Amino acid sequence: MNPMLNIAIRAARKAGNVIAKNYERRDAIESTQKGINDYVTNVDKASEAEIIEVIRKSYPDHTIITEETGAIEGKDSDVQWIIDPLDGTRNFMTGLPHFSVSIAVRVKNRTEVGVVYDPIRNELFTAVRGEGAKLNEVRLRVDSKREIQGSILATGFPFKQPKLMPAQFAMMNALIEDAADFRRTGSAALDLCYVASNRIDGYFEMGLKAWDCAAGDLIVREAGGLVCDFDAGNSYLRSGNIIAAPSRVIKEMLNKIRPCLGAEFNH
């Protein structure tokens, strides 16, 4: 096994144990608001601490970028661990059992390892660049024959950037002409993994951060799916605007989405 994958899995499982234990006693959760519709809990921080401790033991010189702490610079800035210790914090806070731990390893700006762990379902999604993607050690393969007609598409709302809401609803309006239905689950990392595992047919979202989607992005691509930004380019980790789907679906999604976007999306 790839040694960095091994450490990422160990870190994700330890963090998942912290989250699962605290999920059973949510009345003890402490939360603070850090922005518009944006919360952090003591469990996010405890999960993050577990992950950092595991990484630091094996790779003390690597740089770690986390949602809650930001960048923890290491001597080796070529290797970056990009972490969301609890993707789906609001679901966790309200008792909706859908959230995950997301860990990606990027070497010289290329994602080499992706791990997303759902501690409630005990589902571990993994990928190594060039070696494919797996769910609990079973190989994942995107169904390339899928089309947008009758599809189930997942999305997330740009709730931290309300000015993007009109574009969000315009895109949904255009897509529902062909798609059958939408899902809005509250975990971008799991949405991407669900594209990789054929549980949904496509996914799109605006305003994400790298820690939301870096691991899931690799998992989709290693399962044979496509990931791009709204210009069909690859700047999504930077722009936060992402589409993931099998090849036929993504082409049709782009054709529907692009006419809905204003000048702020044109690069």
Swiss-Prot record:
Residues the record lists as binding substrate: E67, L86, D87, G88, T89, R183, D212
MF terms in GO: inositol monophosphate 1-phosphatase activity; metal ion binding; RNA binding
Origin: domain of life: Bacteria
Stored Gene3D superfamilies: 3.40.190.80, Fructose-1,6-Bisphosphatase, subunit A, domain 1 (3.30.540.10)
Matching InterPro entries: IMPase, Inositol_monoP_metal-BS, Inositol_monophosphatase-like, Inositol_monophosphatase_CS, Inositol_monophosphatase_SuhB
UniProt-listed Enzyme Commission number(s): 3.1.3.25
UniProt: Mg(2+) binding residues: E67, D84, L86
Biological process terms in GO annotation: inositol metabolic process; phosphatidylinositol phosphate biosynthetic process; ribosome biogenesis; signal transduction; transcription antitermination
Enzyme class: hydrolase
SUPFAM superfamilies, A to Z: Carbohydrate phosphatase
Pfam families, per database record: Inositol_P
GO CC entries: cytoplasm
The entry's keywords: Chaperone, Cytoplasm, Hydrolase, Magnesium, Metal-binding, Ribosome biogenesis, RNA-binding, Transcription, Transcription antitermination, Transcription regulation
Role played: Part of the processive rRNA transcription and antitermination complex (rrnTAC). The complex forms an RNA-chaperone ring around the RNA exit tunnel of RNA polymerase (RNAP). It supports rapid transcription and antitermination of rRNA operons, cotranscriptional rRNA folding, and annealing of distal rRNA regions to allow correct ribosome biogenesis. This subunit may play a central role in organizing the structure.
Similarity comment: Belongs to the inositol monophosphatase superfamily.
Name this protein carries in UniProt: Nus factor SuhB
Source organism of this protein record: Haemophilus influenzae (strain ATCC 51907 / DSM 11121 / KW20 / Rd)
